[in-house]
Every structure is written in C-alpha cells, then in structure tokens.
C-alpha cells in the first residue's frame, strides 16, 4: 500500500507567501544575494525564458515566485505597489540589511532597536516588494510592550483620543 501523501509538502509550512515579480530570474538572484535565500526549484515558462514557478528557501521558510503574466498574475509595478510586507527574521539584521541595500534594495526605515524587542528595519526590493528585516533581541511581556508603545508613539495632540 502506498504511503499517504502529506497535505503540506515536506519543507513547507501552513502559510507560504507566493509573490509575482517582473524579471523573475533577476529577482531570484537578488534574493539569493541580498537575503541568503537558497533556490530549491525552478520551472520555466512556456517561452523557455520566463519563470512560471520557483521556490526559494529562507532559513526554515519557503517563498514561491512567479513571473508576471498579465493575463494571469500581475507584479507590484503593474498595480501601483503592494500592501504586503514580507517579514524576515535573521541572526544579524544589520548585516542582512546592509547586504540587501548593497544588492539593490532601498532602505525605507533604518534599523533601530524597537519597543517590542526586535532590531528592525524596512526596505523595498527592486521588484516592488517591501521587506522588514529583524533580529529578536529581547523578550517583552504584553504589558511592557503596551507601555513602551505608548511611550514610543508619544503624547496625543490636544482634543485627540
């Protein structure tokens, strides 16, 4: 009797981001260089040049990528941006952030030690996707986090609740 097929394939988690990019080959190389991603799979598109599907491993997580095909899926450039941020936890946020900028990302929020306990910053990749990069530095209780958030956000202007 054949073994039961797993509902979630080996190496994947329950939730796996699947992004659309223009120039998927360049995006794959960027993610490898900037974030240390490992290419796991690649399926060429019908023209033999584009990427219909690719899988990259970031630590213990997977990211699926496909080329923009206007009749099926559109990139952030085609729709005027993306409201989604891909969050990446790493051992050394400073090193990864610098490497990503050197590889072509644009820093949009410099790295800083944040009130929730992470060293955290944000950047945009050359393909229209926003990334946050963080290293968890300190465990913070929900109460400590709420207090620190209030201090971080500062006093509210008069008449505002």
What are these regions, as identified by a protein language model?
Residues 1-22, 28-29, 33-124, 133-161:
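Vicinal oxygen chelate
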Residues 127:
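C-terminal catalytic core of tyrosine-transesterase DNA break-rejoin enzymes
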């Amino acid at each position: 009797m054949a073994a039961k097929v797993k509902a979630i394939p080996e190496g994947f988690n329950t939730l796996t981001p699947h992004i659309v990019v223009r120039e998927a080959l360049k995006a794959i190389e960027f993610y490898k260089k900037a974030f240390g991603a490992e290419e796991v799979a690649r399926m060429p598109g019908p023209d033999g040049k584009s990427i219909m599907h690719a899988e990259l491993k970031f630590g213990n997580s997977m990211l699926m990528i496909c080329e923009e095909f206007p009749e099926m899926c559109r990139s952030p450039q085609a729709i005027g941006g993306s409201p989604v941020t891909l969050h990446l936890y790493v051992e050394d946020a400073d090193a990864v952030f610098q490497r990503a900028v050197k590889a072509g990302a644009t820093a949009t929020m410099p790295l800083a030690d944040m009130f929730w306990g992470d060293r955290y910053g944000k950047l945009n990749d050359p393909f229209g996707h926003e990334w946050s990069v963080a290293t968890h530095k300190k465990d913070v209780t929900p109460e400590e986090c709420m207090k620190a958030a209030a201090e971080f956000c500062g006093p509210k202007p008069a008449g505002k609740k």
